[in-house]
């Protein structure tokens, strides 16, 4: 029983290593390098700390939104939001180091490392201050950014953010053991598909690329380094808790959760309800607005883009 729970624990953490179709074509997809994946937008790159950082840069508005993806994902996680939000704002959707078209290596991979990289990226793009909009792990990175670099953060938009849930030392050790680079690498095609569905109340067909992209890069030259980054990022989220420091964040914060989020709280360690975790975190933020979306899972910005986009625009008025 313990072995089964151990395996399931790892699966739950890896919910953004995804897929959502039952097509037999999964098993016949050609191998692709990360740089070959179609992002539907021009992708630019720059050097930050001698690391190539890739990003989508759309829109011309005075306000800048920095979009930060979650664990195992990339800038394509914002494809349902970029078209609408870029009509009114400048939108920068980044591939964090270790992911997508950015460099992958044995970097520091702490949340503070990511916040520093993002701050330096904004400086290179001549952005003095931005709205940091993060999903899942990206939400926790955004909060670390607000704590470490408050002058660079105008407002926060946190979508299903990591960091609102507490874990004991024992639970943290268990999670670290559950997600190793080898575990990530050995995820089966079927496992990838199951993981994706757990991110949604009802997985939209528009999310199919998440499984096909993920399958294709399994044979990429730097896939091992991607797997290393995912495992290190699980540790990073545990090593830099933010819950007790939320009162230090003075910027206006929009918190968005799907009411049927299956990942928060962690169902294999904690009971309770998503609404309780969402309210717990929002109540600790001095200037926060909480919005919950019915019939919506963890990947709220992709499953309910119209509602998320409208809520974000109203918040940024």
Residue ranges and their predicted role:
Residues 2-63, 88-89, 279, 286-289, ...:
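Alpha/beta-hydrolase fold catalytic core
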Residues 39, 48-49, 56, 96-133, ...:
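Active-site loop/oxyanion-hole signature of alpha/beta-hydrolase fold enzymes
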Residues 51, 56-101:
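Conserved HGGG/HGGXW glycine-rich cap/lid loop of the alpha/beta-hydrolase fold
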